[in-house]
Amino acid sequence: MFTVISYLSLLFISFLFALTLFIVLNKIELI
């Protein structure tokens, strides 16, 4: 059970990182 929770949290963190990177790249292109 602990392995599943740690895997899900890692997936969630990587998703947030990708989303932030995507937003930053879009803002750079807009400027």
UniProtKB/Swiss-Prot annotation:
Localisation per UniProt entry: Plastid, Chloroplast thylakoid membrane
A Gene Ontology biological process term: photosynthesis
GO molecular function: electron transporter, transferring electrons within cytochrome b6/f complex of photosystem II activity
Origin species: Chara vulgaris (Common stonewort)
Family as reported in the entry's similarity comment: Belongs to the PetL family.
Membrane protein topology class: Single-pass membrane protein
GO cellular component: chloroplast thylakoid membrane; cytochrome b6f complex
Subunit and interaction comment: The 4 large subunits of the cytochrome b6-f complex are cytochrome b6, subunit IV (17 kDa polypeptide, PetD), cytochrome f and the Rieske protein, while the 4 small subunits are PetG, PetL, PetM and PetN. The complex functions as a dimer.
Chain ranges passing through the membrane: 4-24
Main location: plastid
Record key words, sorted: Chloroplast, Electron transport, Membrane, Photosynthesis, Plastid, Thylakoid, Transmembrane, Transmembrane helix, Transport
Protein name according to UniProt: Cytochrome b6-f complex subunit 6
Job of this protein: Component of the cytochrome b6-f complex, which mediates electron transfer between photosystem II (PSII) and photosystem I (PSI), cyclic electron flow around PSI, and state transitions. PetL is important for photoautotrophic growth as well as for electron transfer efficiency and stability of the cytochrome b6-f complex.
